[in-house]
Amino acid sequence: MMGVVSLPRVIGKQVYGSLYECDTTVLGEQKVLEQIVRKAAEEGNMTLLDVKAWKIGDGVSIVAIVLESHITIHTWPEYNFATVDVYSCGSHTDPRKAFLYIVKELKARRYTMNEADRSSEF
């Protein structure tokens, strides 16, 4: 009987989208957004390595480096708008759960959510 040959596989799960009509009191608060991205990593079962944040005009850009890849949030309080990207190379992670946690915390009244399978077999 022949054994099954498994090919090397790279896992890639990406969830990204736009958040509209968000709570403006949160969108400009760097420290609050840092806490949100930290908790989002936990919600998505990701291993947080570092968080960097920059105040840009009234908005904030947050980049969380997780062992499995990254989480980003970019905000525009003047438009009640944010974009979010959660990408993971870990089969044990749930980027969708992390994304939806951010949607909830930014109190988005509506949002788009896109999911991409960026996995590859070699």
From Swiss-Prot:
The record marks E68, S69 as: Cleavage (non-hydrolytic). It is an enzyme of class 4 (lyase). The keyword Repeat does not apply. The keyword S-adenosyl-L-methionine applies. Its cofactor is pyruvate. GO terms for molecular function: adenosylmethionine decarboxylase activity. GO terms for biological process: spermidine biosynthetic process. Gene3D superfamilies: S-adenosylmethionine decarboxylase. Keywords: Autocatalytic cleavage, Decarboxylase, Lyase, Polyamine biosynthesis, Pyruvate, S-adenosyl-L-methionine, Schiff base, Spermidine biosynthesis, Zymogen. Catalyzes the decarboxylation of S-adenosylmethionine to S-adenosylmethioninamine (dcAdoMet), the propylamine donor required for the synthesis of the polyamines spermine and spermidine from the diamine putrescine. NCBIfam families: SAM_DCase_Bsu. PANTHER family: S-ADENOSYLMETHIONINE DECARBOXYLASE PROENZYME. Belongs to the prokaryotic AdoMetDC family. Type 1 subfamily. Heterotetramer of two alpha and two beta chains arranged as a dimer of alpha/beta heterodimers. HAMAP family: AdoMetDC_1. This is S-adenosylmethionine decarboxylase proenzyme.
